[in-house]
Amino acid sequence: MKFDILTIFPNIFQSYFNESILKRAQKNGLIKIASHNLRNFTADKHHKVDDSPYGGGPGMVIKIEPIFKAVQHLKVKSHKALPAGRQVKTRVILFSTRGKKLDSKVAKRLSKYDQLILICGRYEGVDERVAQYIADEEISIGDYVLSGGELPAMILVEAVSRYLPGVLGKYESLEDIKGSYPVYTKPEIFKPRTPPRARLARGGKNPAKGEAHQRRQALRTWKVPKILLSGNHKKINEWRKIHGCL
């Protein structure tokens, strides 16, 4: 799987993609991730990628020309890299607040492609003709506005990569998604101990309040649910289904 990201901030991805699961997947040749500077696909000497919108309005808009050139370049490059006769399954995605919500079903569907070209907007968005004629679909990560599509691109790359064979390690599970149900670890019983607020506030000791604080502390214990300590995996799985969020 090849991820090609079109952006005006290509260096923003390096730290995230060079850690953990994605770093290992790239090292093992399971995925390739490349960020491409849209300014390299401009024709003017200033490498201008934006302009003011027709009809007026605040801000600037990413132009269609560099995006079109970049997408065509990446498609041709991928086609040439394959043996003669084989077609590259490519999907061009534009990140947009009005797009389809990214969820596990969308990620799994996208994992069937050979190449995903991800278009990251900036400023006030991109020329609408990108959505109309270049992108195959628009995707959103939620009902809120971000400065650009770079963060959604990072999220999509990891979400899709997890569905590719070999990407997840021995102790990582796709079906039992971490965080889909409550998880606990040692100690079985945790007794939090914090300094008395009176002492912190006044910079000294207050015997009466100190004793009350100690009594309250003695009553505070945070325990692991007994069912998880039972060793009964059938009941544990039932508990997880009841308390799960997926």
Each PLM stretch: what is its role?
Residues 1-74, 218, 229, 235-236, ...:
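N-terminal nucleotide/polyanion-binding subdomain common to many enzyme families
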